[in-house]
Amino acid sequence: MIKTAETYHVPVLLKQSIDGLDIKSGGIYIDVTFGGGGHSREILKRINGNGHLYSFDQDEDAEKNVNNIIAELSNDNDTTSTEHNCGLTFVRSNFRYLKNWMRYYDIDHIDGLLADLGVSSHHFDDETRGFSFRFDGPLDMRMNKRAGMTAADVVNEYEEEALADIFYLYGELKTSRRIAAAIIKARDIKKIETTQDFIKAVEPLFKREREKKDMAKLFQALRIEVNHEMDALKEMLLSATELLDKGGRLSVITYHSLEDRIVKNIMKTGNAEGKMKQDFFGRIETPFKLINNKVIIPDEEEQLKNPRSRSAKLRIAEKR
């Protein structure tokens, strides 16, 4: 069997998230976070040629894994296998454009959508991408290498107040203003171009016992800003809400409180702010029925096998 690129993380909560889709014969499904293809592979196995899967990823590295999936699921003697005849269409795009792409493919309803919002091990472990403070490399952080703005652009060009807001809102760091001031001071001396340049500028502000946690939050905040992650997530989930048929399922895995709050609010109220809507008679209107009232988390065995799954939370909802 041809393996998916080993640099991508092991699919988190694989069985629970796919079970949550309640896959039906002939259904149309979407995996908006293809990555190494782990979740897509399982969906395709359950569709078993009777239905279709649209898989999204904006990273060109992820696209290289598509042929592996096709080879695994196709007859070894079939040399003409393609994405289409194994029930898969790969879309190299940010998932925020979900509705546009479905219109392009003339799809006006779907039966289920899965999103695994975690940054893959592939990104964290590649020093050339700049996602991790463990390596020295270009301060990049773009999920889509074709996108314009890098993390270096953010730290070198944003005003001090804007930087402070990013670190406070997306990193939930109480020392955001001090961090922003330290960056301004450092870049006045020398342009911040690498992860180590950035770390040197802010490291003195962190207490030793919290240094790794706070540095991770700081890198998270920059990554979210560079990739417009919160806006993209809101747009994708609202599009999914429109596209899902009655009884269709939404299965979403989150890894930090900011994205989890958005997912929870949209599943409960239909909007990212969590504002309850009422009809003419004062009855609360909600687009979804929650399948799990409490979040599903990896069990101890999965957390031991895959430490990066520890912060994962799965929420599942069904369209009313």
Where on the chain are the PLM-derived regions?
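S-adenosyl-L-methionine-dependent methyltransferase catalytic core, i.e., the SAM/SAH-binding region
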Residues: 1-320
